[in-house]
Structure formats: C-alpha cells, structure tokens
A protein has these predicted regions:
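Extracytoplasmic/secretory-pathway proteins
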Residues: 19-211
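Bacterial Sec-dependent N-terminal signal peptides
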Residues: 1-23
C-alpha cells in the first residue's frame, strides 16, 4: 500500500502553514471503525475529515482521506478499485506540485493493483492505440504503459522535489524514522517507488513508449 499519508511540517513547500487543526482524534475514530469492520461508519468520519481539510486548504489530509476511503470501500464495493481510480483521477486534474506528484505515484499503484487483480480477464484484450476511458477494455500493454507513464510523471520537477526533506514529512509515512537517511527527500521516495515498478521483469512492455 502507498505509505504517504498526511501532514507535513515543511509549510513553505507544502503550503499548509495556516492549518493548525488536530485531526488525530478523528483519525483514531476511523481506525477504530475499520478495525470493527464498520466501513460505512469509517466513511462518514472520512467525509467529515475531508470537509474540514478542504475548508482549511489541507491537501495532504485530503490525500490521506482518499487512501483510507479505498481501504473502507474494499470490504463492501466489488468495484472499489475502479471507483478509487476515478476519484483519484478527478483529484489529480486539479492538483498542484507537489501534490500532483504524489497523486501520480498513487494512481500508478492503483492501476497496477487493478491490473494484478484482473490480469486473467485482461490477458484476452487487444492492445488499443486509442485508449478507451473504460479500463476493462485495456490490454496488458495499455496498463503497463499507463502505470509507467504515471510513475515517470511523479518525478516531474525533480529539483523542487529534492528540496522537500523526507524527515520534515515524516507524518506522511508509515516507516521507521531511523531509515529516512536512505531516502532523504520526497524525490527519493517517489523515485524508489518508480524503480520498483520498472525493475520488475513482469512489467517489461512489449514496446517501450514512456520516453
């Protein structure tokens, strides 16, 4: 699962300096609802967090809401991944740096997850030159191309991404801080995620079209 989560202390870069709201109690309620297998209750709280974050201009909290909403939907929506993909795509369209980079990396992971779950059915699809908006019609090559393209787009504005220290974004991560020196910036983390995709032999495209 994608590890990037919510608040970041690097306000100059992440632009959330004016949001001093403590979301921790609400997130604890979300976690409790999910542990009790109450996805609808979790969704109600997520809606509350999203509304609050939107009012406060806290995009990272909204990203976290979408990540958790995917987890909540998984237990009762058969098409939860497709629904999440549509939701993330809408958010991606309006996002600005560096949130757009985060969304691209998230979207790449969602498309990859959808492909992995539906790979048998997808294996019978013919590669489309004019890719349809209906991902059920995509071929393996269409998915690999989309995923690879999004991982590359997540690395746009490399110089600026390298100015965001990962330690200053530690609340975004599910990770032990002692390992932050291995990936000192947001760019390093996003790059590592992309490398893991491209280095896997099963993701080798029949025709490379990313560059």
């Amino acid at each position: 699962a994608f590890a990037l989560m919510y608040s970041c202390s690097n306000a100059q870069v992440m632009n959330i300096a004016n949001d001093n709201t403590d979301y921790s109690a609400l997130w604890n309620d979300v976690d409790a609802a999910l542990k009790k297998n109450l996805p609808q209750s979790a969704s109600d709280i997520l809606y509350e967090i999203d509304s609050l974050a939107m009012a406060n201009g806290n995009t990272l909290q909204q990203i976290k809401v979408k990540i958790y909403q995917t987890a909540a939907d998984k237990s009762f929506k058969p098409d939860y991944l497709k629904s999440s993909i549509e939701s993330f795509e809408l958010a991606l369209n309006d996002a600005q740096f560096p949130y757009k980079n985060i969304y691209y990396s998230l979207m790449a992971e969602l498309y990859d997850a959808y492909y992995q779950i539906n790979s048998f059915a997808i294996s019978n699809n013919v590669t489309l030159n004019d890719v349809s908006s209906d991902i059920d019609s995509w071929s393996r090559e269409n998915f690999i191309d989309k995923i690879g393209t999004y991982y590359l787009k997540s690395l746009d504005n490399e110089t600026q991404l390298k100015k965001i220290p990962l330690n200053e974004c530690k609340d975004l991560l599910i990770a032990d801080t002692q390992y932050f020196h291995l990936r000192p910036t947001l760019f390093d983390l996003l790059c590592d995620r992309a490398i893991k995709f491209f280095s896997s032999p099963v993701n080798a495209p029949l025709e490379i079209s990313y560059l």
